[in-house]
Amino acid sequence: EELIVASSALTAEQQLEIFRRYGIRNDVHLRLSSGLFDIITTGLYVKSLGYVPLISVSKVRLTRAEAFAKACLDYFGAALGLLALAPLFVAIAVAIKRDSPGPVIYRRRVLGVGGKPFDAFKFRTMYVDGDQMLTPQQAAELQTHHKLKDDPRITRVGRVLRKYSLDELPQLVNVLLGQMSLIGPRMITLPEKARYGKWDLNLLTVKPGLSGLWQVSGRSDIGYEERVHMDMHYIRNYTIWLDLQLILRTILAVV
């Protein structure tokens, strides 16, 4: 079915709500007569109908060739990475078990494409029930910035793993499962989604990445808003060559 919305009386918020309901449904082809380019930056193109420019919503942002190339890069890259790093995985698992009681793998509930939740795997870097170690001031800082400079919850082994981003290596399994990409925007949780505001529609059109533009920027002290802008820049400017560059920069940063 085709849904054409050409009312000048609708506000941007009302049109955005229409987009949320019908824009990504496979059984509806949505066209809007107003500019949402300042809000939705991916998956849109303009086509005239009776001299009226209508914004149409494309269900597929990448071309078939680009999507195939990215899928191949993700699958074979993750498979090779898991095989090559298997001895390191064993060593890290032993170190975690000796350092503190608790599981080796931590599951973090995050949002994937279309807002579908899944469990992202990480090596455990914190003490079990570590939140009880936080002071009220630290808890407030964590709520605001989603990170702490001197986090008392992190174990000794965890600090080493985080320093070299080794704690995220189990997410290669998520890549093999098709839930993540090697390169993409940073993953977010449901509570974080609200902080993206109008940008959340863009963020959830692609898979979250094991690494990305922000992770290799060399700046760990940037604000949340700038991290969001980096994610949006990647989504707007994706090419397979950009992915290859970021993979190389990620490897060099870790090594």
Annotate each PLM feature.
Residues 1-86:
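N-terminal hydrophobic signal-anchor/signal peptide
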Residues 16, 63-70, 151-158, 190, ...:
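Alpha-helical membrane and juxtamembrane elements of multi-pass inner-membrane transport
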Residues 34, 53, 87, 103, ...:
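Proline-centered helix-kink/hinge sites
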Residues 34-38, 43-47, 105-153, 211-230:
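Short, glycine-rich, amphipathic interfacial segments at transmembrane boundaries or analogous
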Residues 60, 232-235:
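Acyl-group handling in specialized metabolite and lipid biosynthesis
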Residues 65-133, 174, 240, 245-255:
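A hydrophobic, helix-centered structural microdomain
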Residues 145-207, 246-254:
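A short, structured surface patch at a secondary-structure boundary
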